[in-house]
Amino acid sequence: KKLPKNLPLKVKEIEKTTNHDVKAVELALGEKFKQKEFKNLIHIFLTSEDVNSFSYAIMMKEIQNASQNWVQEVISILNKMRSKYADLAMLSKTHGQPASPTTLGKEINVFKTRLEREIKTMKQLQARAKWGGATGNYNVHQLVFKKNWVTISRKFLKESEVELCEVSTQIEPHDFMAEQ
């Protein structure tokens, strides 16, 4: 099942009473399960880093989506300004000294083009999370249930448009955040 849209708000509400971020996520996710026996199994396989890396990935996706819309609006404004000031001559500078002439439209276009490139890069980046337990090896998972946990984890994360970091230690490296 898809995660509810209000999950972050629910987690924050629960966190007020638990004073523990991961426990709040566990309890909020547990509310999705109708059968009580499954509610109690949510945290059995996962470490705080598994839950946190997933949470970070979701937050980064939300930031990515929100900033793409905002940056797209800025690009649109810059594009109008570029056209409006295409012929407005001005003196450019290099090393703080007067240089050859340019136009204000061309200079605005420099920033518009850079933002367009960043939007393109942003759209290509994929949020990742680990889901393999204490050392990233699915040890507890395999001990309790002999399943293909990489496939199960990949499928679960994909439902939230998050890519599985298949090779990790206890900590997901968060490389995708640096790539943003």
Model-derived segments and spans:
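Acidic-glycine-rich active-site phosphate/pyrophosphate-binding loop
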Residues: 153-169
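A helix-coil-helix interface module used to build multimeric assemblies
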Residues: 1-141, 145-158
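A conserved active-site cap/scaffold subdomain adjacent to cofactor or substrate pockets
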Residues: 172-180
